[in-house]
Curated annotation (Swiss-Prot):
Modified residues (N6-acetyllysine): 84
An individual GO BP term: gluconeogenesis
Reactions performed catalytically: (2R)-3-phosphoglycerate + ATP = (2R)-3-phospho-glyceroyl phosphate + ADP
Cellular location(s): Cytoplasm
Name recorded for this polypeptide: Phosphoglycerate kinase
Any one cellular-component term (Gene Ontology): cytosol
Species annotation: Escherichia coli O9:H4 (strain HS)
Gene: pgk
Family affiliation: Belongs to the phosphoglycerate kinase family.
Subunit text: Monomer.
InterPro entries: Phosphoglycerate_kinase, Phosphoglycerate_kinase_CS, Phosphoglycerate_kinase_N, Phosphoglycerate_kinase_sf
Amino acid sequence: MSVIKMTDLDLAGKRVFIRADLNVPVKDGKVTSDARIRASLPTIELALKQGAKVMVTSHLGRPTEGEYNEEFSLLPVVNYLKDKLSNPVRLVKDYLDGVDVAEGELVVLENVRFNKGEKKDDETLSKKYAALCDVFVMDAFGTAHRAQASTHGIGKFADVACAGPLLAAELDALGKALKEPARPMVAIVGGSKVSTKLTVLDSLSKIADQLIVGGGIANTFIAAQGHDVGKSLYEADLVDEAKRLLSTCNIPVPSDVRVATEFSETAPATLKSVNDVKADEQILDIGDASAQELAEILKNAKTILWNGPVGVFEFPNFRKGTEIVANAIADSEAFSIAGGGDTLAAIDLFGIADKISYISTGGGAFLEFVEGKVLPAVAMLEERAKK
């Protein structure tokens, strides 16, 4: 994959527009999970250190496009950056007609989704973004799968378009995991729905030596084996697809599960054989024997790709399966790469971030890359590198 890298450029005195992924959860005006901002800090600091005129922006939440809404302002991100950086940080609301930035100064340009045409990759808006800078740095892997004005369009018109360190590292790590993986390669796909991850399961079934399913996805596979899943979240219309995948590759289906009669944080958990799930019960986690079976598989892996928990780990009574799997990945000597919001939350909860080889900041982009889809922002950077 040939792209221009920000680290290869001299940014001194240049106007540098960094599209980061600062889409973080905010409550009462404060950032509640800073993982994405932390990941972007080295890129921002590198540009500042070189004496660039630094502009950074992102989307945050889902405001009505083209309308300012204080609830989705990047102000909490600016306040966070002020605490973390020794530099002053300014938030600029109106910037499309130009913004003054001094060398070594950082300004945050307000939420790109307040600009009409952002999501449609509007050419006029893209050109306005491009006119603000000498160098465009795409560093938001989490939105690289979307062709939008601040992730894709701007790169077509900026004088120079390059990949930031975070994006470059994501592409390198995913390339290593998917193109030439050390074997055996184990892929874990969890979460609630088969339908949203069916193409991922299909793609991974062709490259992974072992596929593991968890969460609501596993319930569909349990049903495909003829077991009653009671009131569990599963997709009846995809049982045949699950049967097809079971016939073409080795997928361990849970033999024991933790169930409850209601979906609640306080619901007591009952551990039982997968054969004994009652009509009024729902499966909320895999059982101990199933979790240990997965831990054994992971122990022998050389590459692990992890996307999604194996149970409702947010509820303490249904956390054990995901905890056993997470610790098995942490203890493994394999090259491990993890991605997706729920996966990152589990990594934080179990305190294993330093034991995962690479943590991807992307959710949808991570999955689309795994599927082998072309990411528009990356394709644009490759195209610009040829000129």
